[in-house]
């Protein structure tokens, strides 16, 4: 086999997810076992995703990986754990067309090339590591003919990045903390698919696409060691919220969903403040967006928009339907207009058909926006240009898929090197 020069590869696409009941804190740092259950919404991979190509060849002399075009080291324990677990479950692979035959036992000796690309900022609080590790595990499982269901694969992805386990499903997903020491029961399960509640529209305000000062990994460790609020949250608060959130999702009860999502996001950031030294993930712009949503929800009498923030300043806003999303976007663009030379289609990305519905497909549209009547005196004037880098409009989406179109592959099919 060593003299052969074939390259066998698979390309896959995996979504990212946003937690509505947060995961913050591990009880086991090595196996990545959380101190509480969490629930997330998978975001439409058409707008936010990781694409990964994995290749195997007898010509490769070592495992190599490229992330967003730059070669990175695979020596870290998280990558090694994922690679070891997947290789240990590999099956026989045969490609009659190319005359390739890989026996189960051969996988230990063969080296891999991996290329991965996020279509959104890495490490800025948009769960890029979640999509990345989920995509790595999913694509390798397809390459190596691993016969496991997504929940079993989620336990492997979890060892790369905790929230990655939730990106192996579409729709609404629960990561069960489990109780076993080996982590075998700490897996993700789908609560409902993406079609279950398809009225929802999600707008993300990318407040900063810079890398954050405190990584989630070190932030969590410090919170577990120093925050009494985290202990109270994990034991007393989250178990009840998980049950309530499951019920809200099942019944498409937006009022309960909003109340739980917003309070859980705020408590997560309170835990960060209760950490010693305190961790600040949100900034003034984040706080202004919260004020905007809170005032609007109160003025309407029933919740129209839920907000949630992960470990970063970006706001994820979930509107109850398309009509509300149009009004929300108009309000956001009134308070956070683009700089004067910005093309609207690069300021609102993803599903930007919403711009037309909001009457904002021309640059002059923003200048003609009226302040939302119920909140115009309370948020500040329309002078916040540049506070938001851009907006992403999306919705709940599907889980991972294999991309069969070779033009989408990130590695050259002849050499197995990045294109």
UniProtKB/Swiss-Prot annotation:
Keywords: ATP-binding, Lipid biosynthesis, Lipid metabolism, Lyase, Nucleotide-binding, Peroxisome, Steroid biosynthesis, Steroid metabolism, Sterol biosynthesis, Sterol metabolism. GO terms for biological process: isopentenyl diphosphate biosynthetic process, mevalonate pathway; sterol biosynthetic process. GO terms for molecular function: ATP binding; diphosphomevalonate decarboxylase activity. A motif (Peroxisomal targeting signal PTS2) lies at residues 40-48. InterPro entries: GHMP_kinase_C_sf (IPR036554), Mev_decarb (IPR005935), Mev_diP_decarb (IPR029765), MVD-like_N (IPR053859), Mvd1_C (IPR041431), Ribosomal_Su5_D2-typ_SF (IPR020568), Ribsml_uS5_D2-typ_fold_subgr (IPR014721). Its main location: other. The keyword Electron transport does not apply. Its EC number is 4.1.1.33. Gene3D superfamilies: 3.30.230.10, GHMP kinase, C-terminal domain (3.30.70.890). The keyword Zinc-finger does not apply. It catalyses: (R)-5-diphosphomevalonate + ATP = isopentenyl diphosphate + ADP + phosphate + CO2. Pathway: Isoprenoid biosynthesis; isopentenyl diphosphate biosynthesis via mevalonate pathway; isopentenyl diphosphate from (R)-mevalonate: step 3/3. It is found in: Peroxisome. (R)-5-diphosphomevalonate binds at residues 23-26, 78, 161-166, 217. GO terms for cellular component: cytosol; peroxisome. Pfam families: MDD_C (PF18376), MVD-like_N (PF22700). Homodimer. PANTHER family: DIPHOSPHOMEVALONATE DECARBOXYLASE. Belongs to the diphosphomevalonate decarboxylase family. Performs the first committed step in the biosynthesis of isoprene-containing compounds such as sterols and terpenoids. Is specific for (R)-5-diphosphomevalonate (MVAPP). The catalytic efficiency with (R)-5-phosphomevalonate (MVAP) as substrate is 10000-fold lower than for MVAPP. This is Diphosphomevalonate decarboxylase MVD2, peroxisomal. It comes from Arabidopsis thaliana (Mouse-ear cress). The lineage of its organism: Eukaryota, Viridiplantae, Streptophyta, Embryophyta, Tracheophyta. The gene is MVD2.
């Amino acid at each position: 086999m060593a003299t052969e020069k074939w390259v066998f590869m698979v390309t896959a696409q995996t979504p990212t997810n946003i937690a509505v009941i947060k995961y913050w804190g591990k009880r086991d740092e090595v196996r990545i076992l959380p101190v509480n259950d969490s629930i997330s919404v998978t975001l439409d991979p058409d707008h936010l995703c990781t694409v990964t190509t994995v290749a195997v060849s007898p010509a490769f002399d070592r495992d190599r990986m490229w992330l967003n075009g730059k070669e990175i080291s695979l020596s870290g324990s998280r990558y090694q754990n994922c690679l070891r677990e997947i290789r240990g479950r590999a099956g026989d692979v045969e490609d009659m067309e190319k005359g390739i035959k890989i026996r189960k036992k051969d996988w230990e000796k063969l080296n891999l090339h991996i290329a991965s690309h996020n279509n959104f900022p890495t490490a800025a609080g948009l769960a890029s590591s979640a999509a990345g590790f989920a995509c790595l595990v999913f694509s390798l499982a397809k390459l190596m003919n691993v016969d496991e269901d997504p929940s079993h694969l989620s336990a492997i992805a979890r060892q790369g990045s905790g929230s990655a386990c939730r990106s192996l499903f579409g729709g609404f997903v629960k990561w069960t903390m489990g109780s076993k020491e080996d982590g075998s029961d700490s897996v993700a399960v789908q609560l409902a698919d993406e079609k279950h509640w398809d009225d929802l529209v999600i707008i993300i305000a990318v407040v900063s696409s810079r890398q954050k000062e405190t990584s989630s990994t070190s932030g969590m460790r410090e919170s577990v060691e120093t925050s009494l609020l985290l202990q109270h949250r994990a034991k007393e608060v989250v178990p009840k919220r998980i049950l309530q959130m499951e019920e809200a999702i099942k019944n498409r009860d937006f009022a309960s969903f909003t109340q739980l999502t917003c309070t859980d996001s705020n408590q997560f950031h309170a835990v960060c403040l209760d950490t010693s030294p305190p961790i600040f993930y949100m900034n003034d712009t984040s706080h202004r967006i919260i004020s905007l949503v809170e005032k609007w929800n109160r003025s309407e009498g029933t919740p129209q928009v839920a907000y949630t923030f992960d470990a970063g300043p970006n706001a994820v806003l979930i509107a109850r339907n398309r009509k509300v999303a149009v009004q929300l976007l108009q309000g956001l663009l009134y308070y956070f207009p683009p700089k004067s030379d910005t093309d609207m289609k690069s300021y609102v990305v993803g599903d930007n058909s919403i711009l037309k519905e909001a009457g904002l497909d021309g640059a002059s549209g923003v200048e003609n926006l009226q302040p939302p009547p119920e909140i115009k005196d309370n948020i500040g004037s329309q002078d916040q240009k540049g506070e938001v880098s851009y907006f992403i409009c999306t919705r709940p989406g599907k889980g991972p898929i294999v991309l069969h179109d070779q033009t989408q592959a990130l590695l050259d099919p002849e050499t197995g090197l990045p294109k």
